[in-house]
Amino acid sequence: MATLIYVDKENEEPGTLVATKDGLKLGSGPSIKALDGRSQVSTSRFGKTFDAATALPKATRKALGTVNRATEKSVKTNGPLKQKQPSFSAKKMTEKTVKAKSSVPASDDAYPEIEKLFPFNPLGFESFNLPEEHQIAHLPLSGVPLMILDEERELEKLFQLGPPLPLKMPSPPWESNLLQSPSSILLTLDVELPPVCSDIDI
């Protein structure tokens, strides 16, 4: 048997609750409350109840019957225990804030300034732009193959040659003159085959 004594916060009158440990779990047994000399017996009810005093507020409408029954039981059993919960939560919150304050590292002392360890200037990176005296935007470079030069003297020779021109690809013979007769086009497509060997038996 466990006897728990609580003080009613609104009326400041002591009220006692006498219940077994098993009776506090899930509303398995009846709990007897003695407040102001009146004794009330509350038992867990199953199914629909039509009493106005025990009706749930409008916020908890009955959507699923089993869920609402479980919430009714938890509200009935945990009702007198709600007065102790804020004290525990306040203690836990103060412990958490103390831990958070102690875990916050010092901003300047613990860590060096990482930004100054790797200094860089975005303008100091390699620029792949050509200098102004070697601008090639005005040159027609469509079709020019990529040329890789090994030495700088070959680069000077390239600038002495003048602007490069696109290469002229030779057109295939069947596309060179569309006005040719089909027989002349077929003659260009003829391929000489090796002579037939009559000695081999098939």
Swiss-Prot record:
Keywords: Cytoplasm, Nucleus, Proto-oncogene, SH3-binding. GO terms for biological process: chromosome organization; homologous chromosome segregation. One of its GO terms (molecular function) is SH3 domain binding. One of its GO terms (cellular component) is nucleus. The keyword Chaperone does not apply. A motif (SH3-binding) lies at residues 163-173. The keyword Nucleus applies. A motif (D-box) lies at residues 61-64. It comes from the Eukaryota. The N-terminal destruction box (D-box) acts as a recognition signal for degradation via the ubiquitin-proteasome pathway. This is Putative pituitary tumor-transforming gene 3 protein. It comes from Pongo pygmaeus.
